[in-house]
A protein has these predicted regions:
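Charged catalytic cores and adjacent phosphate/nucleic-acid-binding surfaces used
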Residues: 1-9, 15-30, 42-83, 94, ...
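Flexible, glycine/proline-enriched loop segments at strand-loop-helix junctions
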Residues: 88-97, 127-130, 166-167
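A short beta-strand/loop micro-motif in the catalytic core of glycosyltransferases
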Residues: 34
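Conserved phosphoryl-transfer catalytic core
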Residues: 96-128
Length: 287
């Protein structure tokens, strides 16, 4: 696949530095790439420089955390002005919120007999490349494995860090509506990340998409890495029903993970592709 609109670097919870990630994407045949780190724009300049040297198109990207219906939701933004005041302010708030969240996760783990989690997760993060951002849940998970509290990252998420568990701290995120508004005001195209990852009933997922459209969302991510084909089919049906654009990406975090950069299931051919719009500036008032 020569377009990948979802991947992560060491600027957030990925394992590869932005320039290394871009080089890997190029080797895998990707020619249009968006780096979508969690709640930070920190890796974009390095990624853009690397992409330009290889003749690739680097689309500004970010994956913002927000809340809806008591759950943490992720929203992808593309093609925005990196210096737009609304986005810069939102990123600063999220940066602070992520540190508060990491401190809270560490406190909770300490009460369960796992002291030193923040320092340990930070050490894991710094081994990959220090970003100055708070360690994320994968860093905590890797620390738990290293300390022998769990056997692997999957167990860490299943028992301690996943949705609804002790480490699922979300009160530091803005609302879905505010997040979409921030992205729109910054000139972004907006896509709802991996709608099937949320543990929702069918009716709640439909309500999420309806509210997301009401907030001004443009697209949904119908393909996320190697997610099951039946999920892609169900999301495609929703995209058709709601008249949405669609995006797709590997959600690559690092070598040896569940996905590879530039690899994901095919997008159903009849769906309108978000990346087909990137040549045109979104008209914020009317799109």
């Amino acid at each position: 696949v020569n377009v990948d609109l979802h991947c992560h670097s060491t600027a957030s919870d990925g394992a590869l530095a932005p320039a290394v990630l871009v080089a890997r994407a190029f080797e895998k045949g990707v020619r249009v790439l968006s780096l979508t780190d969690h709640d930070t724009l920190e890796g974009l300049d390095e990624a853009r420089e690397a992409a330009h040297s290889l003749g690739m198109q680097l689309v500004n990207g970010v994956e913002l955390s927000c809340t809806w219906g008591g759950a943490t939701i992720h929203v992808l933004g593309y093609g925005f002005d990196q210096n737009a005041a609304p986005l810069v302010a939102a990123i600063a708030q999220l940066h602070d919120g992520r540190w508060l969240r990491s401190e809270e996760i560490s406190r909770k783990l300490s009460l369960k007999g796992m002291p030193g989690a923040l320092e340990g997760a930070r050490a894991i993060q710094q081994e990959l490349g220090d970003s100055g951002n708070a360690p994320a849940r994968p860093h905590f998970a890797d620390w738990m494995v290293r300390e022998g509290f769990v056997k692997d990252r999957a167990e860490a998420f299943r028992k301690w860090l996943g949705a609804g568990k002790l480490g699922d701290v979300k009160q530091h995120w803005p609302t879905l509506e505010d997040t979409v508004e921030t992205l729109r005001a910054s000139g972004a195209w907006v896509s709802l990340a991996h709608p099937w990852h949320y543990d929702f009933t069918r009716s709640k997922r439909r309500k999420l998409i309806a509210d997301y459209i009401g907030a001004g969302g443009h697209a949904i991510e119908v393909v996320n890495g190697h997610q099951p084909a039946e999920q892609v089919g169900s999301l495609a049906i929703l995209a058709r029903e709601f008249g949405l654009l669609v995006s797709a990406g590997s959600d690559f975090h690092g070598p040896g993970g569940w996905s590879e950069i530039g690899e994901y299931r095919p997008v159903p051919e009849d769906l309108p592709l978000l990346w087909g719009r990137f040549k045109h500036d979104p008209i914020i008032a009317t799109v």
